[in-house]
Amino acid sequence: MVDGRPMQITLNLPDRLNQIGEFDQNDWLREIAIALFEQEHISLARASKISSMEIMEFQKLLSDRGICIHYDVEELAQDIQHLQNRSWL
């Protein structure tokens, strides 16, 4: 709730969902996380955690959907640390 009112989110689901016979709980959590991130209700790290995805994997998913990645200095530092931990940087 925000200021005593329930929070409203809008989900823009991809057209491919019409072609999928089974859409499980993980799929719904991923779509909700994307929507919350895109509407700046949660951080990139939180969205990737909700999606049960690595941050870099979640960033790639956002990029594939044309969603801009917005994050603060702390999240940038976390990304750099993540890359260093994997010896990618």
From Swiss-Prot:
It comes from the Bacteria. InterPro entries: UPF0175, UPF0175_domain. Transmembrane segments: none annotated. It holds the Pfam family UPF0175. PANTHER family: UPF0175 PROTEIN SSL1255 (PTHR37525:SF1). Belongs to the UPF0175 family. This is UPF0175 protein ssl1255. It comes from Synechocystis sp. (strain ATCC 27184 / PCC 6803 / Kazusa).
